[in-house]
Amino acid sequence: MAKASTFTMTSEEQALNDHHLFAQVLREALPYIDFLKEKTLVIKLGGSTLEHQQGILQDILWLQALGAHPVLVHGGGLYINEWLEKLHVPTHFENGLRVTDATTLDVVRMVLLGQVNAGLVLLASQLGGKAIGLSGIDGRMIRARVADESLGLVGEIEAVDPTLVQTLIEQGYIPVVAPLGQSADGSCLNINADLVAAHLAGALHAEKLIFLSNVAGICRTDGSLISELNETEAQQLIEEGVISGGMIPKVSACFDALFAVPNVHILDGREPHVLLRELFTDQGAGTMITRKKPPAA
């Protein structure tokens, strides 16, 4: 029986193949790179993806180097839970929101500002970037009121002043924002980070709002990923129960942003280079939600 033939590329052929692949990738990416120049991108980093922060920050620095203006909003729920347990502070949630008394708020502030925010800024600097950490209290950026007395010091956003963030962007910095706000009487309030990202993206008239979480995006009942849908279609999926559980408040935050932001993306932040694949390839890597289509003429 004849032996099956094998084919092995020479080093020159492999190099030529690599060059062709590089050229193909570059041709595909160039229109997207050109489109995103000088555009603001608000990126929300969920607490469940913080262990992948180095890769995410590297991609964010690439976005800035390519001419985009990234703004990072972060959560920190897992770290907050860890410290509350260490300090023997009881905690519980209602409708997905942490009930926050004064003691809990002290821990929330300590973790968000002293650990997560400061850690992201330090890592960005170590990677060669320039980031500045702040929260919604700085410059009275996020004005809020108590959302529900039963939730304690949990804020509902009333207004966002993007001036401080815009100033940092103009100076070449990457703003890193912790989800805290301030009430009319000066009290600090704990605010859901998805909502902070959505309202800040709207105030900045960002080109895109991107949620990095621990899911690939919105999936059909058979588990297949939906790469794109508009807000009307997303609302229908909520009503049908296809979008359920913790994805509902995230998609609701998307709806909050779509009045001022053309596109909102939900990506799995644990996947390598998911930001670059979503923004610079035709195939994408997650789910994009767009504004509902206008009625036909």
Model feature map: region roles:
Residues 285-287:
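Charged catalytic cores and adjacent phosphate/nucleic-acid-binding surfaces used
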Residues 1-270, 283, 292-297:
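Nucleotide/pyrophosphate-binding catalytic subdomain
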Residues 276-281:
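C-terminal/domain-terminus segments
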